[in-house]
Amino acid sequence: MLTKRFYNLAIMQDISNHTPMIQQYLKIKSQYQDILLFYRMGDFYELFFDDAKKAAELLDITLTARGKSNGESIPMAGVPYHAAEAYIAKIVKKGLSIAICEQTGDPNTSKGPVERQVTRIITPATVSEEAFLDNNQDSILVSIFEKNNKYYLAYTSYTQGKIYLVKTLTSLNELKNTVLKLSPQEIITNSRELAQQNPFKKPIKALEEWYYSNFEAKKYINDSLDTNIANNILNLYKNDQLTTIGSILSYLTNILKDTPRHITDISYEQEQDTLNIDINSRINLELDNNSKSSLLSIIGKCKTSLGSRLLKRYFSNPTRNLNILATRHSIINSLGENQHFLKIQDVLSYISDIERIISRVALGTVKPKDLVALRDSLEQLPILKKLLSEKNTPEITNINNRIHQLDELVTLLDKAIIENPPTTIRDGGVIKEGFDKELDELKSIKDNSYDFLIKFEELQKQKTGISTLKVGYNSVHGYYIELSKQHADKIPTEYVRRQTLKASERYITEELKNFEDKVLSSKEKALAREKLIYDTLLKKVIEYYKQIQETAASIAEIDVLANFAERAIKLKLSQPKFNNLAKLELKEVRHLAIEHNIDEPFIPNDTLLSKDTNTLQIITGPNMGGKSTYMRQVAQLIFLAYIGSFVPASYADICDIDTIYTRIGASDDISSGRSTFMVEMTETAYILNNASAKSLVIMDEIGRGTSTFDGLALAKACAEKFAQIGAFTLFATHYFELTELAKQYPNVCNIHFEAKEYKDNIYFMHKAVTGAAKKSYGIQVAKLAGISQDVLESAKQNLYNLEKKQQLTESTQVQAQFQLEPTTQNPLQQKLDAIDINTITPLEALNILFELKKTLI
C-alpha cells in the first residue's frame, strides 16, 4: 500500500483505480519517495503529481494534466529527453536529487506498459558530468554519525576518489563549523533530529539505520576497497570511525547501483597540523567567499580547474606543518627565478580536468569529447616534465616524478577517436577510420550505397523509359522508387507498391529490398561494433586510473605553487619566517583587497606582538582611521603564511598560531530572534571559552548595542581576560578608558591611528602609532558621511555641553562606577563574606556578632 506522502492527498491509496501506466509509475515512485522521478515516455521525461508541481516551479516549465485520479486531473510536467541534462543540472544545483527511470523493455513485445527501471540516481554530491559541477570547487558529500552526544564525521570529494575522516567532534557548534568549512553539496546522517534541524542550511537527509551499522560498514569497506587498503583501514580505525566511513561507501553503492571502485584512498585529517578558523571568522576576514574583494579572488589565479580546487582545499585547511610550508616556499622561490613559472603556466593552460575525466570513465558517464580532452592534456605532459626538470631541486623533482608520461595511452586515443566526436556514442561516428578493419568494412557498405543508388536509378529509367523516375529513402518506409500516377501503365510487374501519395506512387523491388536490408543491417552492425570498440577502449583507459589520478594531483600542486610564485612577484609578497619564540613581528603589512581596490597608494603598518613585551594591543582612533583594516590585514597575513603563500609585508616572522578568532561587526539574527548585542555576546563567549596562548584574536568595537556603562564594563572585562590568557589580541575600541589597562598589565600596550584637522576638515593618516588616541573625531566623520550642517552645528554644541559636564562630574560619577583599579573591599564586608552560615554553631554566631558590634562602635 502506497502512502500519501509522495503524491496528492486527492489520490486514492488503492492504485488499482489508475491506468496501468500510472500504476507502474506509482510502484516505482514508492521506492524513491523523497526525490524527483524522471519517468521516460518516448522522447520525454515526465513527472507526475507533486513531482510535476515541484518541477514546473523549479524549471519554469508548463504544468499540464494527464488522466484522472479520484475524479481530479493528475498533474504532469515534462522535459525533452535530448535536453534533459540542462534541466537536471538546474535541479541538482538547487540541492535536490533525481531518479532516472528508463524504458528497459521492448515496446514491440510488451503487453501493457513497457518495462521501466530506475537506471541512475543523481544527487548533488554524486554527480560527475561537467554540466552539473563547478569546475573550481570540490563536490563534497559529508556523513555525520551521531552517537552518545558525539559526532563522527567523514567526507568524500566524489570525483577525487578519496574519503577523509575528521576527528571526533564533541559539540554541535564544533560540528557546524567543521561542516560549513567544507561547504558540502550534500549531507547524510543517522540523526533524524539533526536532519530536521539542519543547522548547516545544506541539503541533508537522514538515512535508514542499516547505513550506519558497524557490521554493514565493514562489509562495504571490504567489498569496495583494495584488499590491502581495506585491511589497513579495519586495523587502524575504531568501530565508530569505521561506521562513518562505511556509511559513505554504502550510500555510494546504493546511488551508483554498483561498487564505488574509484574510491582508492582513506585518510585521517590531523587537527594539530591545521590552523583553525571558525565560519564566522572566515566570513569576517573575507577569505573565500564569492566576492571580488575576497582573499581567494586576489590570490587564486590558477590555470587549471585542478589547481583551483586544490587551492580551495588549502584555504579550507591551512597547515601548521613547517616541513610542508618549507617545501612550498622552496618551490615558489625556484619557480620565481627568471619568472620560470610563466612557461609552466602556459603549458598548464592547455590541460583539462583530467581528474574528473578519469572519474567519469570509472563511473560510466564519460563522453567522447572527454577522451579527446584527456588525450590533448596528456600530450602536454612531456613538455611540462621537461620544464620542471630544468629546476632540479629535490622538492620539484618529487612532484615531477609523480607526473606520469602516458605515451601509450596518448597514441591509443589518438588512433581511436576522431578529432571532433559527437556528444555521445549513441549514434556512432566516434571511432576514427582505420582503427578497426571490421568497422570500416561495415561503414563502407553504407558509404558506398550512394553509388549503388545512382546506378540503380539509371538502370530503372532505361528499363521503364520514364525519365522522371526517382529513387529515394525515408526513415518510415525505407528505400523506394517513385513514379507519377500518369505512368501507371508503364509499371513493371516486379514493382511492389509501398506507399501512395497524392500525385505519385512509391514502389519497392526485390533487388532494392535486399539492398535496403544489407545497408540497414550494416548500419546496425556498425553501431554495435563501434559501441563494443568504445567500451573496450574505456576498459583500457581505466587501467591508467591510478596513474592519471596521481598525475592530476601533481599538476594541481604545481599549478597552485606556480600561481603563488606569480602572485608573489605581481603583488610584491615576501617569504615569511617561522619562529618558536612566541613572537609575531610584521613590517609594512598591507591589506591586499583594499590595496587592489583603491587608486591612491596603500599605507602599510608594522605589528609587533610578543609574549615578552605585549600580547594585547588596545587600538583607538577615529572611525575610518584604519583600525579594522589594520587588524584584518594581520589575520589575513597569518592565514596566507599557513597555506604556504608568500605574504603582503616587507618582513614577517611568525610564531605558532593554532587558531584565529574574530569578533567583527554584527547584525540582528532575525530568524533566530537574536539582537545585534546578543549575537555579539554569543560570539565573544565562544572566543573567551576557547582562546589560548597560541590564538590570534581580533576584537572590533565590543560592547556596542547596550548602555555606555554596560558596554565599557564588558569590554574592560573581556580585554583583561585576553591579557590573562596571553592570546595575541588586537582589541579596537572607542572606550578610551581601556587605554589605562596598559598601566596595570605589562603585556598590554596602546596603539592608535592619527588624524589631522585642517580648516574644519579631517584627514586620516592610516598610520598606527604607539600610545592612546586623544580624540575620536566623530563629528568630522559625520560631516564626511553627508550629515547636514545644521545637525553638525547642533552636535558641536551638544559635545561642548557634555564635555563641560564631564569635567565637573568625571572624578565622582564615572570613576566611582568604572574605575580601572579594582575597588578595595570594605573590611566588614570581607568578614561577612568569610562566614559559612551552614557550618557555624549558635555560640560561634553570637561571638561573631559581638566582634562585629565592636568593629562598628
From Swiss-Prot:
Any one GO BP annotation for this protein: mismatch repair
GO CC entries: cytosol
First and last residue of the signal peptide: none
Pfam annotation, one family: MutS_II
Domain of life: Bacteria
Record: residues binding ATP: G621, P622, N623, M624, G625, G626, K627, S628
InterPro entries per UniProt: DNA_mismatch_repair_MutS, DNA_mismatch_repair_MutS-lik_N, DNA_mismatch_repair_MutS/MSH, DNA_mismatch_repair_MutS_C, DNA_mismatch_repair_MutS_clamp, DNA_mismatch_repair_MutS_core, DNA_mismatch_repair_MutS_N, DNA_mismatch_repair_MutS_sf
Keywords: ATP-binding, DNA damage, DNA repair, DNA-binding, Nucleotide-binding
Gene Ontology molecular-function annotations: ATP binding; ATP-dependent DNA damage sensor activity; damaged DNA binding; mismatched DNA binding
Similarity comment: family membership: Belongs to the DNA mismatch repair MutS family.
Protein name from the UniProt record: DNA mismatch repair protein MutS
Chain's gene name: mutS
